[in-house]
UniProtKB/Swiss-Prot annotation:
Its EC number is 1.11.1.7. Binds 2 calcium ions per subunit. This is Peroxidase 7. The keyword Calcium applies.
Amino acid sequence: NYPTQDSTMDKTFANNL
């Protein structure tokens, strides 16, 4: 579960992985 404010950042990070 990702926080709303960090969702974009987390998705980008996950995409990098």
